[in-house]
Amino acid sequence: MTAPKLHPGAEFLRNVFGSSTEHPVFVCSLLNAEARGTEPVNERPLATRNLGYISRFAEKWDRPGRGLYFCVATVVPGARRRAKETLSELNCLHIDIDFKNVAASPEEARRALAQCPCPPSCTNNSGHGLHCFWLFAEALQATSENIAEVERLLGLLADYLGGDRAAAEVSRLLRLPGSHNSKDGCWVEVVTESNGPLVRYELDALCKWLEAVSAPLIARRPPEKGNGQDSNPWLEVAARYKFKPPIDVEQRLAA
């Protein structure tokens, strides 16, 4: 009897997590920002290593008004939510490049990535940008020390390659290949772009590379000014009193 064909997202997760980790992979479906309130439940989570479960979950929840995501780190067994305190294994460095936020064209960005001394292990086209991954030869336990070191490197990587700084954290959700980006009425498939053989890196090699770079290889566009004012007085007051507004998770998710 022929085994059912796996969803592309399940195949991707097997390649990324299969040989270097042991604990559950976190996958979820989230309502798009513009679709909030149209369904009673926003987040539909799944934490498992069963590829069949992931395939069926992806087929069920890949639909307009929602997005399918996976966490870049594994979670502890039994976890029902994704947060730094529920992470188990750190498996990669990653970057979220939004084409509208960088000065390079999509093809220029791809060429720059390919020319890096340590090119990405794999790259996904998110529909409006690139999600790139530098896989570790061996996963790291998600201790506070390892989290701090990996997030330091994620910050260097984002600065060097024009990535979103908000995505430079170890519990990040990124779009699942084989699903569709349906924001603002679009229906664009998230696809894995071939980078050749899957390369895994020692953390020391990535550290030496990122600590040696200077000027950005992919520059970000300067932020646009809103109404002609140089600053937002409300944000200035918030900064003065060290007030932090609640994080809008969907707004921060990758394009």
Please annotate each region the language model reported.
Residues 1-130, 136-152, 159-160, 218-221, ...:
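Signature for HUH/AEP ssDNA processing cores
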Residues 12, 153-156, 209, 237, ...:
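Charge-rich, solvent-exposed alpha-helical interaction surfaces
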Residues 24, 188-235:
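Long, charge-rich alpha-helical interaction segments
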Residues 37-50, 107, 185-200, 248-253:
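Short, polar loop/linker segments at the starts of domains and inter-domain junctions
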Residues 75, 178, 254-255:
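Short, hydrophobic/amphipathic alpha-helical patches that form generic packing surfaces
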Residues 134-138, 177-178, 192:
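Short, structured patches in soluble enzyme cores that scaffold and shape functional sites
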Residues 155-187, 206-220:
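Flexible helix-coil linker/hinge segments at domain or subdomain boundaries
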Residues 221-255:
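N-terminal structured subdomain of primase-like DNA metabolism proteins
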